[in-house]
Curated annotation (Swiss-Prot):
Residue segments, region Disordered: 106-165, 254-283
Biological process annotations from GO: DNA repair; double-strand break repair via homologous recombination; leaf development; maintenance of root meristem identity; maintenance of shoot apical meristem identity; negative regulation of DNA-templated transcription; positive regulation of transcription by RNA polymerase II; protein-DNA complex assembly
Tissue-by-tissue expression: Expressed in the shoot apical meristem (SAM), roots, flowers, embryos and seedlings. Mostly expressed in flowers and siliques, and, to a lower extent, in roots, rosette leaves, inflorescence and young cauline leaves.
Domain BRCT: 482-577, 598-713
One of the record's GO cellular component terms: nucleus
Transcription is among the record's keywords: yes
Pfam entry (one): BRCT
Zinc finger (PHD-type): 402-451
Designated name of the protein: BRCA1-associated RING domain protein 1
Phenotype of gene-disrupted mutants: Enhanced sensitivity to genotoxic stresses (e.g. bleomycin and mitomycin C (MMC)) due to reduced intrachromosomal homologous recombination (HR). Meristem defects associated with ectopic WUSCHEL expression at high levels (e.g. 238 fold higher than controls) mainly in the outermost cell layers instead of the organizing center. Abnormal quiescent center (QC) in the root apical meristem (RAM) and defects in cell differentiation leading to short roots and loss of gravitropic response, probably due to defect in columella cell differentiation.
Source species taxonomy: Eukaryota, Viridiplantae, Streptophyta, Embryophyta, Tracheophyta
Composition-biased stretches (Basic and acidic residues): 118-134, 155-165, 264-283
Keyword Metal-binding: yes
SMART domains xref list: BRCT, PHD, RING
Length: 714
């Protein structure tokens, strides 16, 4: 059982010795005390690097220069050292015979002439050796005054033959040889112990001691009670065993160099070995925590003495959590214009995977392409086959090679129609340039320098729609068209959620009555043509709400059919939409009549503050609606507080706090209720503090859709 335990613990002893070497300071050769990381990635004790900096500034190993403020404390290394001490103590309890004593039975006079501990010994090793000596019965290999004990075979009290112990310790030495051969085969950096084991192989291959002598050497290396006859042992192997007993495994290498080289060569070679081994040990030690060190360098607050402030860990965790929150946010960036902003000029954000539109949680997959509807609509080489987008990836790759003339960012796939012109734009950037000209039929653009150039459809008159041939016009209808009132030429049509057939019908109507089609809302629109369901209700879109606020006609697609049938625009009132899908009634008619009589706007005199989280772009649309309705936007809580202080004597406050009542995307049912409830509580606290009224964002939409103020809380 004891033999099995020893065989099981041998790897632990080997790796603990390796770990101890990695945790030692290259200067004092003791376990790191308050470890400090230099910019060159070398680690030393705080006191050692302080003493070294008084002699020469810079790293003692690589000699690189650095200011004192660039040093970083490695607090986690102290925890690693503490764990190592606990592991070493646990192994010492269960396997005391494998502990390497501090002093050797046979000291070479040329190597050690003093009784004091060596320079590289650590306090932990001394304490461990004392404990082992006590457990071994209080006998030590040397006397109290430091002189060696008698070494003759007659004075050796132990039995001469301990087969199981010698076999076990011989296996332990073979384990050293196996580890060294494995590291050499895989080209890994060798530690101090592995280098010593490698030297053992070279010596034993040349001198070839007997098996009995090898067993005595191994037994004497790890058992304190053993005291073999020095006459039967090779002195070179004895020096190796002495180095293994000490805390500095390079003693054997140094002794061998002293024996073979002159003094000057010995000093240079030992210094080189020390520098190389120390740098390799520090490099291996810092491979894993290098990323953590970089985070600490970026986030921790450094005082004038180069010490980390007490709250650096808290600040680091806060910054990491903020970065994670920002990374996991639901913002998607357009592949063309490199912007996440959603506005009327950009259109909604669309998401495509392999040419097919996706929604929900699928939009955050790695293979999904995000583009604005306007950007993909005006991309020259992108086209549709049904609902599938073709050539999108190739167009994105082409656009990423072209810089925008306005913002100098890549992704400008839309170029000027003039072939010799090298100007290219993002679609949102081009819309901000008033002198750009647009062809909404062929999706062509003219830059300000070539705005006088004619589009193809302007050279040969209005082009017939490719989607559907125009109905034949007989001479009688042609005469009626000539007699059409002049105001029909000023028709500006804007479709809202129309089907493909309704879009073709609107194009035919525009050609027939010389009307203009606007794909986006603008104040010049005269008719908003919206699709309706079987009940005659329309979808509540931004175009419909803007049309209501501006007093425009909000009509259904039947008006276009009736106008084409009558060969002239018919009266719009019978086709005016009365209700939307949310149940709000008579909003378009009420708004239109009030606009005709120049009555105050819907939100005249009201001031709105939008509180909390909103989807990017959606909040801007809400604020634009409020402005068009006559309301005022308060951008900060300070402005809200100042407004409430001005209206202290007013019984009815004019300031309104608006919060988002839509649940976040992708949340479970229980989480949605909790989040919305928390938003309402926070908004209510702000409203009560400033004396404002509190509403959800749907209150704004419903008031506009019905063109009347709904009841307000508070």
């Amino acid at each position: 059982m004891a033999e099995f335990t020893n065989m099981l613990m041998n790897p632990w002893v080997l790796h603990l010795q390796k770990l101890e070497l990695e945790l030692k300071c290259p200067l004092c050769l003791k376990l790191l005390n308050r470890p400090v990381l230099l910019p060159c990635d070398h680690v030393f004790c705080d006191s050692c690097v302080h003493k070294s900096s008084q002699v020469e500034s810079g790293c003692p190993v690589c000699k690189s220069k650095h200011p004192k403020k660039a040093r970083r404390d490695l607090r986690f290394m102290e925890s690693v050292i503490s764990i190592y001490k606990s592991l070493n103590a646990a192994v010492s309890v269960h396997l005391p015979q494998l502990q390497i004593p501090n002093d050797c039975n046979y000291k070479n006079d040329a190597l050690n002439n003093s009784n004091s501990p060596k320079h590289g010994e650590s306090e932990d090793s001394e304490m461990t050796d004392k404990d082992v000596s006590k457990r071994s019965g209080g006998t030590d290999s040397s006397s109290r005054d430091g002189s060696p004990l008698p070494t003759s075979e007659e004075s050796d009290p132990r039995p001469k033959h301990q087969d199981w112990t010698e076999k076990q310790l011989s296996d332990h030495l073979l384990l050293y040889e196996f580890e060294s051969e494995y590291d050499a085969a895989n080209h890994t950096p060798e530690s101090y112990t592995e280098q010593a084991a490698k030297n053992v192989r070279d010596i034993t291959a040349s001198e070839q001691p007997s098996n009995a002598a090898r067993k005595r050497i191994c037994g004497d290396s790890f058992i304190q009670e053993s005291s073999p006859n020095p006459k039967t042992q090779d002195p070179t192997l004895l020096r190796l065993m002495e180095s293994l007993r000490s805390d500095d495994p390079t003693d054997y290498v140094k002794a061998q160099n002293h024996q073979q080289l002159p003094k000057s060569h010995t000093e240079q070679d030992s210094k080189r070995k020390r520098d190389i081994t120390a740098s390799d040990a520090m490099e291996n030690h810092l491979k894993v925590p290098k990323r953590e060190n970089n985070l600490m360098q970026k986030s921790a607050d450094i005082d004038c003495n180069g010490k980390c402030s007490a709250n650096s860990d808290d600040q680091l965790s806060e910054k990491i959590s903020k970065a994670l929150e920002q990374t996991s946010s639901n913002i998607t960036i357009c592949g063309f214009c490199q912007s996440a902003r959603v506005s009327e000029a950009t259109g909604e954000m669309l998401h495509y995977s392999r040419g097919r539109p996706v929604d929900g949680d699928d939009i955050f997959r790695s293979n999904v392409i995000h583009v604005h509807s306007a950007c993909i609509e005006w991309a020259p080489q992108v086209y549709y086959e049904g609902d599938t987008v073709k050539n999108l990836k190739a167009e994105l790759a082409r656009g990423m090679k072209i810089k925008c003339t306005k913002c100098s960012l890549k992704g400008a796939a839309l170029g000027c129609f003039v072939k010799s012109c090298r100007r290219s734009y993002h679609v949102p950037c081009a819309r901000e340039i008033s002198r750009c000209r647009w062809d909404y039929e062929d999706f062509l653009l003219l830059c300000p320098a070539h705005s006088s150039v004619k589009f193809p459809n302007e050279k040969s008159g209005h082009r017939v729609s490719r989607a559907e041939p125009l109905p034949k016009i007989n001479p009688a209808e042609l005469c009626s068209l000539e007699q059409t009132p002049a105001f029909t030429k000023e028709l500006v049509l804007c479709g809202s959620a129309l089907s493909k057939s309704d879009k073709k019908l609107m194009e035919s109507l525009a050609v027939r009555f010389n009307a203009t089609i606007s794909r986006y809302w603008n104040p010049s629109v005269t008719h908003v043509i919206a699709s309706t369901d079987e009940k005659g209700a329309c979808t509540r879109t931004l175009k419909v709400l803007m049309g209501i606020l501006n007093g425009k006609w909000i009509i259904n697609a039947a008006w276009m059919k009736a106008s084409l049938k009558a060969s002239q625009p018919v009266d719009e009132e019978p086709f005016e939409i009365q209700i939307d899908t949310q149940g709000c009634q008579d909003g378009p008619k009420t708004a239109r009549l009030r606009a005709e009589t120049n009555k105050p706007k819907l939100f005249e005199g009201l001031k709105f503050y939008f509180f909390g989280d909103f989807y990017k772009g959606y909040k801007e649309d809400l604020q634009n609606l409020v402005k068009v309705a006559g309301g005022t936007i308060l951008n900060t809580e300070d402005e809200l507080g100042a407004e409430s202080s001005n209206n202290v004597n007013d019984q009815r406050s004019s300031s309104i706090v608006v919060y988002n009542i839509d649940p976040p995307h992708g949340c479970a049912l229980g989480e949605e209720v909790t989040i919305i409830w928390q938003r309402a509580n926070d908004a209510e606290a702000l409203a009560s503090q400033t004396g404002s009224r509190l509403v959800g964002h749907t209150w704004v939409l419903e008031s506009i859709a019905g063109y009347k103020l709904h009841p307000v809380i508070g």
